[in-house]
């Protein structure tokens, strides 16, 4: 246990930050799952784009708050964008 008042305060601050970081990471995971669910359900392209934008927004919010490294975020967004593009191409192939 910390003895100094500043160390006690840091324990409190770290708990708060850990909680908020956990919430932010959970938002990212959930938004990515929703995006992938839209792709799996073979839904409309508009739904997929909306889900992609939501996931991308949550990922970038994590970067701005320091929860996630920018390179990790870029890799995740790139992967999701590639899946969206493949989904778009598959829809174009089936519509013709």
Swiss-Prot record:
Keywords: Ribonucleoprotein, Ribosomal protein, RNA-binding, rRNA-binding. It holds the Pfam family Ribosomal_S20p. HAMAP family: Ribosomal_bS20. It comes from Anaplasma marginale (strain St. Maries). GO terms for biological process: translation. One of its GO terms (cellular component) is small ribosomal subunit. Coiled coil: none annotated. Binds directly to 16S ribosomal RNA. One of its GO terms (molecular function) is structural constituent of ribosome. InterPro entries: Ribosomal_bS20 (IPR002583), Ribosomal_bS20_sf (IPR036510). This is Small ribosomal subunit protein bS20. It comes from the Bacteria. Belongs to the bacterial ribosomal protein bS20 family. NCBIfam families: S20.
């Amino acid at each position: 246990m910390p003895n100094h008042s500043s160390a006690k305060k840091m324990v409190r601050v770290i708990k708060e930050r850990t909680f908020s970081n956990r919430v932010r990471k959970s938002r990212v995971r959930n938004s990515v799952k929703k995006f992938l669910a839209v792709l799996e359900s073979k839904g409309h392209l508009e739904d997929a784009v909306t889900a992609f934008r939501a996931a991308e927004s949550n990922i970038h919010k994590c970067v701005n708050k320091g929860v996630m490294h920018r390179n990790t975020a870029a890799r995740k967004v790139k992967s999701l964008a590639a899946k969206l593009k493949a989904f778009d191409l598959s829809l174009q192939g089936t519509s013709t």
